[in-house]
Structures are given as C-alpha cells and as structure tokens.
Regions:
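Charge-dense, low-complexity intrinsically disordered segments
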Residues: 9, 63-66, 70, 74, ...
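Gly/Ser-rich helix-loop-strand patches that form or flank binding pockets
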Residues: 15, 19-21, 27, 96, ...
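Structural beta-alpha unit
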Residues: 1, 14, 40-43, 66-117
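Small/aliphatic-rich secondary-structure junction motif
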Residues: 1-63, 90-92, 156-177
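Short hydrophobic/aromatic-rich motifs at helix boundaries and adjacent loops
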Residues: 52-57, 77-79, 108-110, 146-148
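Alpha-helix N-cap and loop-to-helix initiation/capping positions
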Residues: 71, 132, 166-170
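Conserved active-site and cofactor/substrate-binding residues in soluble primary-metabolism enzymes
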Residues: 74, 78, 135, 173
C-alpha cells in the first residue's frame, strides 16, 4: 500500500504538475507527501562560479558562493512553500526537506523510506529536452529501487498510464503498486 510519496520539486512547471499528480495519489491512498528540494552543490562548488568570476574579472568565491547559496536556498524555500500550499488546499499531510547536495543522489538517498516517487519528466530546462527525460529524472529512475511515476504534460487522472513489464522480479514488484 502507498502511504509515503516523495515529491522532488524545483519550482518548475513540470514539478508543479508532478505535485498535482502526487496530491491526487495521496488523496486516493490517504498517503503523506514528502516534498524535497535539493540545492545543487555543483552550482556552488563547480566550474559555474569560477566561470562567473572570470567573466567579471574577480577572484572566485570571494562573495559569490555565499550570495548564490542564499539565492538558491530562497528559490528552494519558494518551491517548497508552493508544495505545502498545494497539500494544505487538498488537506493532504506533508513535510518538506531543503538540503544541499547532488540532486539525484539526495533524492535516491531519501527514497528507501518511501513507497513511491513522483517527479516531472524534466525540470527547469524542460523546454529544451525535445521529449527526453531530464538528467535528474533519468538518474533517479535508474538508481532507485522504489516505484517512480514520471509525469508528463497531462492533467492528473486524465486517463491511462503505461507500465513497462519484462517479467523480472523488479517488474512484478512494480505491478503491486
């Protein structure tokens, strides 16, 4: 039975749609939703900041890392507030986690406590994916052993869904969701 649903959110339109799906599933199964936003450590410690510093002609990390971390955390809080608002409007119990790390890894590390993960097909760069899965979505699907519902552009509850089945034990387990 589905009692705990993990919903990663970056505040994008696809994440918002995933929240709507998760709310519908939580309502049906009387489940608790667990929202998570991960501040991508690669944006704080990787070449991104060095490139900005070089473009501006300043030494890297002097003030930028702290300022960018604050901005990214604020963006995460905003995304999680929207998640909490959607849950409150639907009278669905929820909790939220704001963390910093590698995005897919952080989601997968939280997944063993969950019965289902619901996430959007793509995130903030979705318009450039040309129908492909976003890198975070693909990494989560490949790495977790939990069932994953990847949402598209349709309205929740709008119709059928597709389940891939190859006869393996993992596929049989997935059908029990």
């Amino acid at each position: 039975m589905i009692k705990h649903i993990l919903v990663p959110t970056d505040g994008s339109s696809m994440a918002t749609l995933a929240i709507h799906y998760a709310v519908a599933w939580a309502r049906h199964y009387e489940a608790t939703l667990h929202g998570i936003h991960v501040v991508d450590v690669k944006l704080l410690e990787g070449p991104f900041l060095q490139d900005i510093s070089a473009s501006l002609g300043t030494a890297p990390y002097i003030n930028y890392q702290g300022n960018i971390a604050m901005l990214l955390e604020e963006r995460g809080r905003t995304a999680l507030e929207a998640f909490e608002k959607a849950c409150a409007e639907a009278n669905i119990p929820c909790d939220v986690t704001l963390t910093t790390g590698l995005v897919a890894r952080s989601i997968v590390e939280k997944s063993p406590l969950m019965d289902l993960i619901v996430l959007g097909r793509g995130g903030e760069h979705n318009q450039w994916l040309d129908g492909l899965l976003g890198s975070t979505t693909e990494a989560v699907v490949r790495r977790t052993d939990r069932p994953v519902l990847v949402t598209g552009r349709d309205t929740p509850g709008a119709g059928r869904f597709v389940a891939a089945y190859d006869g393996s034990q993992h596929a049989r387990n997935a059908l029990h969701v």
